[in-house]
Amino acid sequence: MNLSLPFVGREKEMSRLRQLHQQRRHVLLLGAEGMGKSALVEQLREPLGLHVCPASEHLSEIRNSLEHSLGLEAGDFDLVKRKNRLLKSLKEAKRVVVVFDNASWTTPKLGSFIESVSLRVPVWLCVRSEHPWDVGRIWPLLVRFEHVELKPFHPKETQKLVASAVVKKVVPEKTLEITGWLHHRAAGNPKILCELLTEIARGHHDLSRPHGLRLLDLDRHLHEMFPAMPFDK
């Protein structure tokens, strides 16, 4: 079930990212799994003209993505010439910012490419951790990056998300009564909150009974582990 939930919160972080974009600074967008790094970048992609690379450990996929976004044909160039042409195009492009989404462990080859890009245009790295054993080859570069950290939702942000989902009739109005439970169960994690709201939208759970809430949480876990299974009652 694909649920279109409203994007709420993160106003402070969005304002900071817009400021850093204007200043042409490198950015390390840091946050644990589910904090909404990709969703935040997607909100800014079109307004700021971001060039977002896919989450990949393969340099070829990232290079192909950048070539496509810059309107470059692959042609018959060998890999070295393609790389040099791409870097030259990035340097000559106006107001380009390259985002490497989900930049986890980077190999020496990929890390070297990211460094080459960062010498020509501002780079944003979306990572779950800034520890060297998690990010790999790019770790020495991070001293040049401004840190923007996404933390768990405050209860008021959870309330805003639930209220927005109710207004858009994504979930029933009764959901407002369990906002505190939702925030506690998700520990403020936006991804888990959205998964719980998705389960509520299926309409299979009695939100007024503790047993119904336990089943709601169980179904969320089941859909997380086995996303292809419907688990419909």
Cite the ranges covered by each PLM segment.
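Sensor-1/coupling segment of RecA-like P-loop NTPase cores
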Residues: 31, 100, 104-140
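Conserved alpha-helical scaffold flanking the Walker A/P-loop in AAA+ ATPase domains
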Residues: 78-93
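Conserved C-terminal helix/linker of AAA+ ATPases
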Residues: 202-228
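Conserved NTP-binding/hydrolysis module of P-loop NTPases
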Residues: 50-53, 59-77
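Helix-loop-helix "sensor" segment of P-loop NTPases
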Residues: 132-184, 198-211
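Walker A/P-loop nucleotide-binding motif
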Residues: 23-41
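N-terminal pre-P-loop "Q-motif" helix
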Residues: 4-17
